[in-house]
């Protein structure tokens, strides 16, 4: 209701739900629920990995067939370069985007803002730009 009241006519449903949108049954459920509500068009994202755990590739082909428009482990980086490489290969084959959460948690964990003069002045642990850049560069090379 809120999206439509604000003039929004379409929304992307991210996969970080319970249950995680990591298979065709959940993708189909999300689509049907959106259609039944009839307010805004709902475009489901599928998870890249099963359970958004970053261990096993989710069934991308099946989720595309069920209506997934893109893939993401929404809020969680895919740490495995091999898993991301395979996901990107599927994305290319099915012409769907991957929305990666680019953040190296070994650098970012515990950070609350961008690293810099202000984080130092406030005494807060900053997140270095490299935490994002490492994953961006990796994924560009893998793509």
Name each model feature, range by range.
Residues 14, 45-47, 74:
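Structural motif
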Residues 24-45, 89-100:
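Alpha-helix-loop-beta-strand connector modules within alpha/beta enzyme cores
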Residues 3, 7, 42, 71, ...:
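Divalent metal-coordination and catalytic microenvironments
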Residues 19, 50, 106:
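Surface-exposed, flexible loop/turn segments at secondary-structure boundaries
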Residues 8-13, 39-43, 115-124:
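Gly-rich Lys/Arg/Thr-decorated short loops/hinges at beta-loop-alpha junctions or inter-strand turns
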Residues 1-37:
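Metal-associated gating/positioning segment near the N- to mid-region
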Residues 55-143:
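Histidine/acidic residue-rich metal-binding segments in metalloenzymes
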Residues 47-53:
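Active-site beta->alpha loop and helix N-cap motifs at the rims of alpha/beta catalytic domains
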């Amino acid at each position: 209701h809120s999206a439509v009241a604000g003039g929004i006519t379409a929304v992307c449903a991210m996969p970080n739900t319970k249950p995680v949108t990591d298979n065709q049954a959940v993708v189909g459920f999300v689509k049907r629920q959106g259609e039944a509500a009839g307010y805004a068009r709902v475009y489901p994202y599928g998870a890249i990995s099963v359970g958004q755990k970053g261990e096993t590739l989710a069934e991308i082909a099946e989720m595309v067939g069920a209506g997934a428009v893109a893939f993401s482990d929404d809020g969680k980086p895919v740490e495995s370069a091999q898993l991301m490489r395979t996901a990107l290969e599927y994305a290319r084959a099915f012409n769907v985007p991957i929305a990666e959460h680019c953040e190296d948690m070994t650098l970012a964990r515990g950070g609350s803002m961008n690293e810099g003069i202000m984080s130092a002045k406030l005494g807060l642990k900053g997140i270095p730009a490299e935490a994002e850049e490492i994953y961006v560069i990796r994924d560009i090379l893998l793509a």
